[in-house]
């Protein structure tokens, strides 16, 4: 069996470019593989003389004759009588199948068992619904079919499958546009099509493709869906060969695209072309699945139909009355305007979706340049209800990309930056959804944003910026600059004033600025605020840019947003707003004096003297980097200092993060030591501030960290355990082992290392930014290089973006002056060799 399987796989891989071009060819390989397995299953079943007491059925992919290289062989064995005699023979039969290399998943049940299990579990019922008889008798087949016909009513089955699908979707963030999709289970993957067929079979009573093709409702959609299904089967077969898994990893994508022998476009790699084709087909399957579910739901929902001119409303859905649309082009946008102003209507019915999709060709240059349709689109952007879902529907029907042609270029556009987890278009819609949710209701932690977004003069400006902020990707060059021009031209075309169009364009051009500044620069430094204020110029721009930035980052990768990043952005916003409003701004020394006074208020007697002496050791920068709350907490810890031990404090911050304070005698290579200790204590550093006393004898270090071992919020007891672990690692530092952190295999990505050096002549320091792939003990390696080259780290901001990091260090020479260019070159060379 193994040799035949290898032959089928080798032939498939050898002819992959042909199969890729004509996906229906994959069915021969799937069927050949299934048939070979079937021969083995049946031959051995008969050799063990089991047919008198048992029947055997093929389930799942085996039942559909769609066996992939990594598929399990699903068997349903029906025991004819309750007291079977040849149980030992059956056990030896299953064992032999495993010995022959088959991954067997099987059940052994009597007819009564099937009745009980299939009646309770929709998954089991579905497996019998689609099973195929291998060795059986008409009598047993009839009994099984009779049980199935009475087990699940149509509506009950439909609801079960809908709930099952919703749970599955949650595992993939409810989108078919994940960058490394699971080709079996992701939304838009094979399971979506199979689920749609189960609904068609059980709820619509269609037995096969021919019945579906003859139907009035689905005849025009089934062929296209089958073509998409075939393509994704091609991709799954190839992925099973390359990795033996169903997830289409970045590494697999590159290997498979090479084997497909694709010809690249001007600005797109072949892998991008392949993945765009995947997402196009995944979207088609997702839409087909949705069509089937919505069609059944509409057919079983009783609601009065109300007529409103060209439209009708049934329940919470709106439709367009039948007839040609060639002279009713305005209805394409009018229907969305109607939804946007009616709270009780939230979607379009299935026949109308089909009608709109069939008439997308009416969106031509005349339509795009018509002032009336421009006004309609603006009205949609100003909708009171359902905006983000309407724009997503417009995209799914092909309307949005037909109207904004450049948007069509980013549909399915990959993002090989190792921190986005969605395609450009899916990320864009998540940005718009975040904006919409922020506008509708105040969310915990976003009270400021809720207030700001509802005070905007023109909400459509923000939505246009969100829609266009990444539209320049995949076109070659700086996507912000490309998008700025596209967005300005479009905004002008649809009727915005020059000033408003310029604002949209400026937002697109600068949409990365605020996140970059907050994550790389010291926002407690007045120069950082002054420089950013000069870029922004006024509070109107600042408000729009802040709202765009927050919602952009939140839509990038669910795992990357946290309260710390939010606080940095919010502080940058508030400080810049104060600057633009010309509010009185205290000097660095004034801030230090105020904060020191606030701290000293809570102490008295000998404690007051001790803390005053401690605080007197530091200059104004220490107080500017730590607010009064932090200073009070740190001072309280210092009072509990034990002779010969470092002062260590741990506390929760921003719900899921841990703030660490460590006061210790300053020494050469201290940052390197602390980083190693925290790493081996299970903590991942995302921000570090190092303050040294005036005589350089004491170092007060503050770290913001993430607990590496799980994402659950730690309780107080666990926080204390973390503190104890840090102290233990301090005491046993000389015997600590290296980090064993695991990261993904990223061999297919070029080894990147970008080092950027900016000298701050006023502070006599350097801002060193290092961009590279994440790897075990990376921060420790960087700290080691910096230490060996005679530099001292003043602050560090560790920005982990998925599998890529952008680490920014404020460093100075051991002589307390800026680092020379020659030394920076040595550091860069050493980092290149080490990383």
Mark where each language-model region is.
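Active-site flanking loop/helix segments enriched in acidic
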Residues: 20-33, 175-185, 317-321, 373-379, ...
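Active-site nucleotide-donor binding segment shared across nucleotidyl transfer reactions
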Residues: 37-87
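Conserved nucleotidyltransferase catalytic core and NTase-mimicking acidic/glycine-rich helix/loop elements
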Residues: 2-3, 13-16, 152-296, 346, ...
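Divalent metal-dependent catalytic cores for phosphoryl transfer on phosphate-bearing substrates
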Residues: 65-89, 227, 423, 451-581
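Regulatory modules associated with amino-acid/nitrogen control
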Residues: 256, 268-317, 389, 531-835
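N-terminal regions immediately upstream of nucleotidyltransferase
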Residues: 1-52, 70, 174
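Conserved NTP/Mg2+-binding pocket subregion across the NTase superfamily
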Residues: 3-11, 91-192, 196-200, 705
């Amino acid at each position: 069996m193994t040799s035949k399987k290898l032959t089928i796989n080798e032939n498939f891989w050898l002819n992959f470019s042909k199969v890729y071009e004509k996906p229906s060819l994959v069915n021969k390989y799937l069927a050949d593989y299934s048939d070979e397995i079937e021969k083995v299953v049946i031959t051995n079943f008969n050799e063990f003389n089991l047919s008198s007491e048992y029947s055997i059925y093929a389930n799942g992919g085996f039942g559909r004759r769609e066996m992939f290289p990594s598929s399990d062989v699903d068997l349903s064995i029906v025991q004819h009588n309750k007291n079977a005699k040849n149980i030992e023979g059956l056990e030896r039969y299953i064992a032999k199948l495993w010995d022959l290399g088959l991954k067997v998943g099987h059940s052994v049940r009597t007819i009564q068992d099937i009745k009980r299990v299939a009646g309770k579990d929709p998954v089991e019922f579905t497996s019998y619904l689609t099973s195929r008889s291998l060795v059986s008798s008409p009598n047993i087949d009839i009994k099984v079919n009779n049980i199935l016909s009475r087990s699940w009513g149509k509506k009950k089955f439909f609801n079960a499958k809908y709930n099952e699908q919703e749970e599955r979707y949650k595992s993939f963030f409810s989108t078919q546009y994940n960058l490394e999709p699971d080709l079996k289970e992701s939304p838009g993957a094979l399971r979506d099509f199979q689920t749609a067929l189960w609904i068609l079979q059980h709820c619509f009573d269609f037995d096969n493709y021919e019945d579906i093709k003859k139907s009035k409702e689905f005849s025009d959609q089934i062929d296209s869906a089958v073509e998409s299904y075939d393509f994704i089967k091609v991709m799954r077969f190839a992925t099973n060969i390359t990795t033996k898994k169903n997830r289409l990893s970045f590494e697999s994508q590159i290997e498979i695209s090479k084997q497909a022998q694709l010809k690249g476009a001007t600005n797109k790699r072949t892998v991008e072309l392949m993945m765009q084709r995947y997402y196009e087909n995944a979207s088609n399957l997702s839409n087909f699945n949705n069509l089937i579910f919505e069609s059944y739901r509409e057919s079983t929902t009783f609601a009065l139909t109300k007529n409103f001119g060209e439209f009708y409303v049934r329940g919470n859905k709106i439709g367009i009355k039948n007839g040609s649309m060639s002279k009713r082009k305005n209805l394409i946008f009018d229907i969305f305007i109607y939804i946007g102003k009616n709270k009780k209507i939230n979607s379009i019915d299935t026949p109308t979706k089909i009608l709109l999709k069939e008439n997308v060709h009416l969106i031509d240059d005349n339509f795009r340049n018509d002032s009336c349709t421009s006004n309609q689109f603006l009205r949609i952007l100003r909708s009171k209800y359902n905006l983000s879902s309407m724009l997503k529907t417009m995209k799914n029907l092909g309307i949005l990309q037909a109207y904004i042609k450049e948007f069509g270029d980013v549909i399915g556009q990959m993002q090989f930056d190792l921190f986005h987890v969605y395609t450009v278009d899916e990320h864009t819609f998540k940005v718009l959804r975040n904006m919409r949710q922020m506008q509708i209701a105040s969310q915990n932690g976003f009270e400021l944003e809720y207030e700001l977004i509802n005070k905007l003069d023109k909400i459509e400006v923000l939505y246009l910026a969100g829609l266009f902020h990444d539209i320049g990707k995949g076109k070659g060059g700086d996507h912000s600059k490309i998008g700025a021009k596209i967005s300005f031209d479009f905004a002008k075309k649809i009727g915005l004033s020059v000033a408003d169009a310029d604002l949209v364009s400026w937002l697109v051009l600068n949409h990365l600025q605020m996140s970059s500044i907050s994550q790389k620069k010291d926002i407690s430094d007045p120069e950082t605020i002054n420089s950013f204020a000069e870029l922004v110029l006024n509070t109107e721009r600042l408000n729009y840019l802040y709202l765009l930035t927050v919602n952009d980052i939140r839509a990038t990768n669910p795992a990357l947003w946290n309260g710390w990043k939010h606080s940095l952005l919010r502080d940058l916003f508030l400080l810049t707003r104060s600057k633009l409003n010309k509010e009185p701004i205290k000097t660095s020394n004034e801030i230090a004096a105020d904060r020191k006074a606030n701290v000293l208020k809570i102490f008295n007697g000998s404690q007051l003297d001790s803390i005053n002496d401690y605080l007197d050791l530091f200059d104004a920068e220490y107080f500017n980097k730590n607010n009064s709350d932090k200073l009070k907490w740190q001072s309280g810890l210092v009072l509990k200092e034990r002779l010969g031990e470092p002062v260590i404090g741990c506390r929760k911050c921003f719900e899921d993060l841990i703030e660490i304070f460590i006061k210790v005698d300053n020494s050469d290579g201290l940052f390197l030591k602390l980083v190693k200790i925290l790493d081996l204590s299970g903590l991942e550093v995302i921000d570090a501030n190092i303050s040294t006393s005036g005589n350089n004898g004491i170092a007060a270090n503050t770290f913001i960290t993430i607990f590496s071992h799980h994402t659950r919020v730690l309780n107080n007891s666990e926080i204390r355990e973390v503190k104890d672990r840090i102290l233990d690692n301090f005491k046993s530092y000389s015997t600590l082992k290296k980090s064993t952190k695991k990261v993904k295999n990223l061999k297919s990505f070029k080894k990147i290392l970008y080092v950027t050096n900016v000298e701050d002549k006023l502070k006599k320091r350097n801002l060193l930014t290092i961009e590279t792939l994440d790897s075990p003990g990376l921060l420790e390696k960087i700290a080691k290089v910096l230490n060996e080259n005679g530099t001292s780290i003043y602050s560090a901001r560790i920005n982990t973006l998925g599998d890529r990091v952008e680490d920014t260090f404020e460093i100075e020479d051991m002589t307390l002056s800026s680092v020379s260019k020659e030394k920076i070159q040595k550091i860069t060379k050493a980092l290149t060799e080490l990383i």
